[in-house]
Amino acid sequence: MVALSTLSGLSALPFLFSLVQNVYGVSLEVSTEKGNSSSPILYGFMFEDINHSGDGGIYGQLLRNNGLQGSKPGLTAWAAVGDATIAVDAQNPLTEAIPHSLKLDVKQGASGAVGFTNEGYWGVPVDGSEFLNTFWIKGNFSGDITVRLVGNNTGTEYGSTKISQSSNSSNFTKVLAKIPTKKAPDGAVLYELTVDGASVGGSSLNFGLFELFPQTYKSRSNGLKPQVAQPLADMKGSFLRFPGGNNLEGASEARRWKWNETIGPVENRPGRQGDWSYYNTDGLGLDEYFYWCEDMGLTPVLGVWAGFALESGGNTPITGDALKPYIDDVLNELEYVLGDASTKYGSLRASYGRKEPWKLTMVEIGNEDMLGGGCESYVERFTAFYDAIHAAYPDLTIIASTDQSSCLPSKLPEGAWVDYHNYNTADNLVKQFSQFDNKDRSVPYFIGEYSCQQDNAWPFMQGSVAEAVYMIGIERNSDVVKMAAYAPLLQLVNSTQWTPNLIAFTQNPSTVIETTSYYVQQMFSVNRGDTIHNVTSDSAFGPVYWVASSADDKYYVKLANYGADTQEITVTISGKTGGKLTVLADSDPKAFNSDTQTLVTPSESDVKATNGKFTFTLPAWSVGVLAAH
């Protein structure tokens, strides 16, 4: 279906041209004989904290620079209110992990409200749920603390609470408050904390580690932001690869993602300098990733650090005996995840509230070790990690971070997988349609990252159709391609390090941008069979591509029209009488959805078959899914 909003922006000539497009036809007959089994976990997610996809994104905590973490945090996002000043204070650390606090100095003779604001991650999304606010206070104080969520430009109050509190100058006291809210029309909202200036004039107070959460996805403590989590849940993916990606590797050994610094109370998590320009709080840590998987029914794919930092940073790659402490660290991590409560690290997990071990079946060793000087040493490093992990956990599927044979042992251990990444232009993705047709079936593939990349800020129609063509090729070979994930996954529009991305968002609580590629991924993931069927056709592949599958008594035929002409499609499936047709299309191959426009969305229609024959139109530049019953 061509979106009307797209047509309204076209000149008369292209519009008339679209009315006289050539119409071609393709006839397909789907065999009811079962073919290859299709991977049950084919479609899923790759996540790392890039584009503020974690902090400021799917992680529910809404205040930026909330713990003043890092060696020189500064006052980013903070501002003083009233007759007071604020400063970063290293003399009054909250904990060893949170070495700074926010010092509020109130002027002698102050009056009225004094305190500070936090602007969040380019705004605070107030969605109308009950918010939970925690912070720590130190200093001689007894009185009321007022917390408000207030329009930055309008002064409109979207939530407030008053807390009667006392504290002393010897220790930090934790404060917890619930804030009823009403939904804000945009993200231009500030968090504001004030006290009565007259009662504290000429004195100072210290505040530490602020947290502000809306009602989280599945009501998890320290959980996910529903605004961002729900579109992912709607995709019905099957796996989550975490924590990266480049953000696993770090710029050096010291700056790698350290699992043991992402667990337990958040006041004991120091965070780290992330690999995409900003500091990571690590509030979204190891356990939170597993809760995410549990709440969305996702198979976890845990990436572990493998002795190599980005571009051979620091003293990496690490080889030989020097690698042993890092192998031991991974074994400790796996005991934390999989060990029962009687083990050292399993008991630590239990002490943090999770008695039962997590469900983990897949571990990936490193990330893109074919790049940046990692290839030559990866044979040794992969083998060392593989041998240790496999000896301790023989049932785990272990994935190499590359498929390049020059970086891998001459013979991979039986059961090991390889990870292949493919960022490419639209035309090249289409050319790779048959890439896996003749692959060795003894080595399973994980396509850990792929998308159309050609200097496009947003996924666009031609690129998304090309991705669909590539995905059809993957699904036809889903006996050997076990998993595939579009990347990157998420993007805060205000702070972007990589484009395009699958889902974008702002801090307007109503704004989530579901891109053309998002809809393709959703259409393919939701309509999934467990068996691939042979299809006979009167046409060769191109510009129309197809794959057929089934689950129980339902058949799915996925199609892509990578061209400017309309295609009349006939699909015959013996015994089927009806179904649902979902089509994503736009006659403009450059059409895209963004934070300022939504031009392309799928259309759904009921279709009937005559003697098992379905007939329908596949417009120019389109992706279609027929779910037949």
Curated annotation (Swiss-Prot):
It catalyses: Hydrolysis of terminal non-reducing alpha-L-arabinofuranoside residues in alpha-L-arabinosides. Glycans are attached at residues 36, 51, 140, 152, 168, 171, 260, 494, 534. Its EC number is 3.2.1.55. Pathway: Glycan metabolism; L-arabinan degradation. InterPro entries: Alpha-L-AF_C (IPR010720), ASD1_cat (IPR055235), Glyco_hydro_b (IPR013780), Glycoside_hydrolase_SF (IPR017853), Glycosyl_Hydrolase_51 (IPR051563). GO terms for molecular function: alpha-L-arabinofuranosidase activity. GO terms for cellular component: extracellular region. It is an enzyme of class 3 (hydrolase). This is Probable alpha-L-arabinofuranosidase A. It comes from Aspergillus flavus (strain ATCC 200026 / FGSC A1120 / IAM 13836 / NRRL 3357 / JCM 12722 / SRRC 167). The gene is abfA.
